[in-house]
């Protein structure tokens, strides 16, 4: 497993965008570039800034299709205007965006000895 972000050209007009997330796993998105539009399959995590990778490949308008509603597939959706997600997965997306679900995920990281650093908001005047 490559431990870096990269764009891999699979064939003419088809690309894999690899994102190495939190030092523990790769997540992937796929871009298919047509003559008038491009189709992005999944958008990884919201922190990815996946649009910057897409813009390195094409300037065409981009439609997004999510394979399912888990946050590692829909996290970057807000960077795009047209998103396709099944109705059933809309509810899943909500569950996976829930604070308690995210808290459970972080707890799982800690159990596996993954370093989790907490940020605190400190007001200064």
Task: For every predicted segment, state its role.
Residues 47-125:
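Active-site HxH/HxHxD metal-binding segment of metal-dependent hydrolases
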Residues 5-55:
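Conserved beta-strand hairpin/beta-sheet module of binuclear metal-dependent hydrolase folds
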């Amino acid at each position: 497993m490559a431990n870096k972000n990269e764009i891999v050209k699979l064939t003419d007009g088809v690309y894999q965008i690899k994102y190495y997330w939190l030092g523990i796993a790769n997540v992937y998105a796929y871009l298919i570039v047509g003559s008038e539009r491009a189709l992005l399959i999944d958008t990884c995590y919201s922190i990815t800034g996946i649009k910057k990778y897409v813009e390195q490949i094409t300037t065409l308008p981009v439609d997004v299709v999510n394979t399912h509603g888990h946050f590692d597939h829909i996290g970057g959706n807000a960077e795009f205007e047209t998103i396709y997600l099944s109705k059933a997965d809309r509810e899943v997306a909500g569950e996976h965006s829930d604070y308690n679900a995210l808290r459970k995920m972080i707890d799982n990281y800690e159990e596996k000895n993954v370093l989790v650093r907490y940020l605190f908001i400190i007001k200064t005047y």
